[in-house]
């Protein structure tokens, strides 16, 4: 008998993070379901189909097969990005990415990790909400401005304001 290693709402034990980097970079920006690992008294930790996602198989004898980890999470993120781009064809891919990040939230389990810096380096901004990302143009005030600016610069050993853009809103 085995039990899932990660708690519901937690990150997959197979997740790659920037936690050990300690340089302020956040990896990943979002987290998607990548399956879980089973804790077994004899096998120790192992993957199992019961805790994995499923997809169609190339093996005709087995129509479905489990897949997990980065392969599963990346496929789900790509699916969500494609759906956002389909609903909002005028958005750039950078804006699609921004919509995914903007819709993300931490679960209660993720919030138990500790400091905000630790959560950001392990979970990024959290799990994106597909409905918010897909329909935020219609139901929420979402302002997308694509341009380049450098808001802060380092001068004399401290951060200083640099650039700021003001935009007139249409209401």
Where do the model's predicted regions map?
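Catalytic-core environment of secreted peptidases
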Residues: 2-75
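Long, K/E/R/D-enriched contiguous segments that form extended
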Residues: 3, 20-22, 101, 116-122
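Secreted peptidase-domain scaffold signal
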Residues: 119-171
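Divalent metal-coordination and catalytic microenvironments
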Residues: 30, 80, 100
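Short, small-residue alpha-helix embedded
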Residues: 73-87
